[in-house]
Amino acid sequence: MSQTAIIERAAGSMMKPIRVAVIGAGASGLVTAKYLRQARQYFGILDIEVRIFEREDGVGGVYKYKVYEEAEMVSSKYLTAFSDFRVPKDLPDFLPVEDYVRYLEGFCTQFDLWGIIETNTEIVRVSHTANGHRVFFRRSPGLEVAESQDGEESWDCDAIAVCSGLNNVPSISYIEGLENVKHLHSSEVKERTQFGLNTSVMILGVGETAMDLAHLAVTSEAREVVMCHKGGFFCAKKVVPLPVVMQVWKPDPHQKPVDTAIASFLDTAYLPERLQHSNLLWSVYDKTFKALHYLSGGTAAGPDQWVGEIEGERNNVDSLFLVKSDRALPYLNEGNRPQDIFSRIRAFVMNIELKNTSGRKILTAPWPLAFRDDGTVVFPDSKKREHVEALSRVIKPDLVVAATGYVRRFDFLDDGYPEPSELDVRGIWRRGEVTAGFIGFVRPGIGAIPPLAELQAQLWVLNLLRHKYPQQMALHAPDASQGESNDDAIPHYEIDYALKARGGHDLFKSKHGVEQESYAYQLALDMGSAPTFSFMKRQGFKALFTWAMGSNFNTKFRLIGPWRWTKGALPIMRGELFDVVKQTGGGVFFTTYTLLPLLLFGSLTLLLHATAGILRLVGMKERANKMLGTGNIPRREGDNL
């Protein structure tokens, strides 16, 4: 018997099985439970006892219980799908939410999760114990319950994973007199018929849900639809915005999803720290993004977006949640597109295909100051052209829909558990308290929460096991964040992934806003799962091309590292993902958004490395290191939050 086997057997004899409570059976909870259940096959530990507690009667979370008619995903199936369970090829790139719920149900079947999911079970309270945590829960009336006061039960466990979701506690902004009008939170709207017949509908907010609901309203039997916003919005199409040329050449209706089109090589992978931490990277992408929009639609604010432009310092993609639903945009633009001769010529030569709205429009207005006793709206003064029509009318809405988001709050946690702002390890747990993990509570500026939740789950489970089984885990999973690595993994360093604070708004502080590609890559570096160029080169052209020219798909980080799944990950990289990455998105997009940034950052990277090499030759090693890296740690969770 080898020495390693002897050590493993000795460690195994001292191990005690651990119990973990997963709160929530949405995408984040399911993928967390899956990795907890798979830990034995990867690390040789004892089976982990996992229980998933879900308040509703099925899995899916927000995608099943807080959706509306015609809702569909704003992230593509290529990015959204978990690394080892892919969406069938015959389904559309952007899944209707019903299909995504079926996907999650299939995930439960594939990884044998149904037996550990307890539906219709609400978490009442979670408290600390001497050795871990105690979860108090209550099952819905009619279900078999234990004999206890009010049907309340409890379960002691070693760790908890809070996966209750971002969209859990509705937030409705205070407006004086709102009680004088009928109003609903967006989570209460399910279908067009709720808008009524010959009614005036007001939508508060301009996020993705607001856009979808405004579209439902304007295509319903409502008489009037008004959309109110505070500071504007930045619309970004889900697919590459290819224009119609000379009103003759029309692009293929099936276009490349934007979230698959980011070349990660020299964007995250192998970009020197000095460049990655500088403002240059964001500045280039901000300008190329806006240039692409202008070329294809005549306005930098968004593709054919003539209302709601964000003004001042905030108008930068490094500080925004981009709105990826553009269904309402044609109706918002109605009557607002410029009609001067230059604009007409430009639109004739090249423009996004315009949808026929049959004259129906959505009015825009500033955020209401108040609602009078009779229900009429009091607006602030505004000189903006887009607000003229709404402010010239007496607006008396029959229904106000507050698409104003949700609050990050965990009322079931006792005092002593961290607040959202205190999760100072990648927004997942509070340092020194790894037994309480929070999965799925970061929000990307453009991207998707489920794939980030998968990477968070991988990192959290890995560190939980290191905490519980330090000897056993030392044999199986080197700690990349402490400099332990292997030749196939890129050495650990710190990425700048936080959205920036601009114009008095800080989405990183208030909503844990991150840049998808950078945050995903940081988690991969933390685990030692980011493969090197030399490793990818050995996997063949298709895998190398997908790694370099595609986004940071989670499957990319299953090729090496503690959760290595090379046998399954390589075919996905060479097949499904290669097939979408190889699409150029059209010459204008490829040149503007991919080729030019790649050439720029490639040239700067070569220059920095050449300069650093010369400095090393003359014995100035410290100066050489400073040439490539700033030595500064970017803004992190817990920094002045």
Where are these regions (language model features)?
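Flavin (primarily FAD) cofactor-binding/catalytic cores of flavoenzymes
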Residues: 2-70, 86-491, 502-641
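Hydrophobic membrane-spanning alpha-helices of multi-pass integral membrane proteins
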Residues: 498-500
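Generic alpha-helical secondary structure signal
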Residues: 74-77, 431
